[in-house]
Amino acid sequence: SSDVCSSDLPQVDEVLVVCRPADVDAMSALLPQEKVSFVFGGKTRQESVQNAVDTIDDCDLLLIHDGARPLVTRDEILDTLHRAEETGAAATGVFVKDTIKVINDDYEITDTPDRSQLIAIQTPQIFRFDLYKQAMEKAKAQGGNFTDDCKLMENLGVPVSVVIGEYTNMKITTPEDLPMAEAILKAREAE
């Protein structure tokens, strides 16, 4: 997100963009040059984040954000950052709108969790750097592949605080997502 890379976020000292080697030139053309470096991704999300973490000598907080969520707002970033400063681990999320069902291997419903206790976790996810490194080391020792950074912290026994975000901080992963993203951008421009 351009907000994460923005120079009007003085709390962010450095931005590491994790991408494929073939995408560096295209990404470089889109992003501001100051504060931004590129790191090659791995085979999994966890490996990609590990590649980035390995390039960092030391920092207070590690902010992890999905490039597929370009509509994150400055307020969401700052609110999550402030919560992580207080608690050591925080993530942005929204309450689920749909009723969620648990199914078995035969696609039969086996349970209905209480929707009021379900959050769809988004990014940014922000953690104390020392805690995150411990969580990565533990996961590596266990041989687990975690698709979510909050789960790494849960595995370490560290509670993660949730900051209620915006539904507009959507993940753009399919062609059907693009018209919605365009509508959000147009609405923001009109404000």
Task: For each feature predicted by the language model, list its residue ranges.
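Acidic helix N-cap motif at the loop->helix transition within catalytic regions
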Residues: 23-30
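Conserved donor nucleotide-binding strand/loop of the catalytic core
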Residues: 32-45
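Short internal beta-strands
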Residues: 16-20, 93
